[in-house]
Amino acid sequence: MTNNIKLIQKIHESKYQITFVSSGGGTNAISSLLKVPGASNTVLESYIPYSKKSMDLFLNRKPDHYCSLNTSLSMAANAYKKCLQIDNEYKKKYFIGISVTASLATTYTKIGDHKFYISVQTESFTKSVEC
């Protein structure tokens, strides 16, 4: 955990500011960022649209699949747009929208594999990873 704390401290010391949105597994990342002093320098907002209706509202549409690459990309794009709404255009090169959507262990019989998608949106690029 010490390495994670050091990494998060470096993030908080940077010029970057983020809006983080997570649904399903991955919500602990928000908690981890907020636990380390300096979070107010980094985190502009965080969202946890956990229910389907909440996700529909966050995306302004109902996605084809809630845990998918397309949904993760849309979440990150909307998170980036939230950054722009909060602060002025001067800092936009330092804004990052980050999203995580995951389908992991649950209390009912799971249909399909465990999976997650992480996406990052900035002014100049979009990146994602899936597993």
Regions found by a protein language model. Give the residues of each.
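Short alpha-helical segments enriched in small residues
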Residues: 1-131
